[in-house]
């Protein structure tokens, strides 16, 4: 990647003789004279640069300039990201919206029980998954959870489980709130695929109040495993959920708490089934077929 970015070497066709096109699935664009497709997962760094490091913002900005100059086709996972690309100066004719898919794995009651035992979970729980970084809005989630257990009787026996690796952006307020919530919050770190599936299946609800994402795959995964979803209004996650999720202003912990109260209440089963049905419309087969159409168009010169 560094060689591509700094030296423009080696050229892709020297590594892949006989290739007819190149698809860059990250911001690392290989130099090439072949047709180039690029996946742009999101432009969150333009929407909220304060949620990224200065070095990261510089890298993303330079990469975006190269995408605009060099890509024949730009593949995005959501209409929200497509709209951001157009606002950033990308020609709409080069954009292709191809949503991600989801594939679940079988999970037994014993696996769920083992996960709960291993993590010391004796109560129902709200689940969050992701990398812990500012744009994920964990502080907003913690504030919402504190309101939920303080103000809603249904949440008396409820914990919060945070799954995923540490990212960047140490927040003293977040740390203090975690300390105040004590054993009601469980931070697991990264889980393997089987544990993660069990975590989704065992959750009473899933909350993902990110400020911005390119797609929000955890939301789709949660729906597929039957966890009612609370996520951010006005974002791509609302696009993924359709009518199957509960939407809240990510800047309003009280609104998030209210949606969570609904998700764990009498509407739980209906929301869970609606999420499963919605998730069935997102398949990797459809995703692959749509990519193949773009590739054929590039090779044929139609793009």
Which residue ranges define each predicted feature?
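Carbohydrate transferase catalytic cores enriched for Leloir-type hexosyltransferases
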Residues: 1-303
């Amino acid at each position: 990647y560094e060689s591509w970015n700094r030296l423009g070497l080696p050229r892709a066709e020297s590594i892949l003789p006989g290739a007819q096109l190149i698809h860059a699935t990250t911001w690392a664009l290989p130099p090439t004279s072949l047709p180039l497709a690029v996946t742009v997962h999101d432009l969150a760094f333009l929407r909220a640069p304060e949620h990224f490091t200065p070095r990261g913002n510089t890298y993303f900005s330079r990469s975006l300039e190269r995408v605009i100059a060099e890509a024949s086709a730009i593949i995005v996972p959501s209409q929200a990201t497509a709209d951001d690309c157009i606002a950033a100066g990308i020609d709409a004719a080069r954009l292709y919206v191809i949503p991600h898919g989801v594939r679940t794995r079988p999970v037994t009651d014993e696996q769920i029980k083992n996960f709960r035992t291993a993590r010391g979970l004796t109560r129902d729980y709200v689940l969050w998954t992701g990398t812990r970084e500012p744009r994920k809005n964990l502080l907003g989630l913690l504030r919402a959870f504190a309101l939920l257990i303080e103000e809603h009787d249904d949440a008396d026996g409820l914990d919060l489980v945070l799954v995923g690796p540490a990212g960047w952006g140490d927040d003293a307020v977040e740390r203090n709130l975690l300390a105040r919530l004590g054993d009601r919050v469980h931070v697991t770190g990264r889980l393997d695929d089987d544990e993660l599936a069990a975590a989704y299946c065992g959750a009473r609800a899933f909350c993902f109040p990110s400020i911005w994402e390119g797609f929000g795959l955890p939301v789709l995964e949660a729906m597929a495993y039957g966890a009612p979803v609370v996520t951010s209004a006005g974002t791509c996650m609302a696009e993924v959920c359709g009518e199957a999720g509960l939407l809240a202003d990510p800047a309003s912990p009280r609104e998030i708490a209210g949606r969570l109260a609904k998700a764990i209440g009498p509407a739980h089963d209906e929301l869970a089934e609606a999420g499963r049905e919605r998730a069935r419309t997102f398949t990797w087969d459809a995703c692959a077929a749509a990519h193949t159409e773009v590739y054929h168009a590039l090779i044929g010169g139609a793009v």
